[in-house]
Amino acid sequence: MALPKNLIPMPRSRFLRVKCIDCGNEQIVFSHPATPVRCLVCGATLVEPTGGKGIIKAKVLEVLE
């Protein structure tokens, strides 16, 4: 009987490096936030929570592992 390769599944959530559309500030955010994530410089909303994966309103530059 063959065992599966991964007994523990990898999480589907990731950290993202995003760029604010209003001011150009780069910030690291979580892909599944529980609260709204705002830009630290101008206060614009970058990610809105939805009970699962958040709605990303900024430009995603990189997906961090």
From Swiss-Prot:
Annotated positions binding Zn(2+): C20, C23, C39, C42
Gene3D superfamilies per UniProt: Zn-binding ribosomal proteins
Record note on cofactor: Binds 1 zinc ion per subunit.
Pfam family, one: Ribosomal_S27e
GO terms assigned for molecular function: RNA binding; structural constituent of ribosome; zinc ion binding
GO biological process, one term: translation
GO CC term (a single one): cytosolic small ribosomal subunit
Keywords annotated in UniProt: Metal-binding, Ribonucleoprotein, Ribosomal protein, Zinc, Zinc-finger
Cofactor: Zn(2+)
Zinc finger (C4-type): 20-42
Subunit structure and binding partners: Part of the 30S ribosomal subunit.
PANTHER family: 40S RIBOSOMAL PROTEIN S27 (PTHR11594)
HAMAP family (UniProt xref): Ribosomal_eS27
Entry's family note: Belongs to the eukaryotic ribosomal protein eS27 family.
Name this polypeptide is given: Small ribosomal subunit protein eS27
Gene name as annotated: rps27e
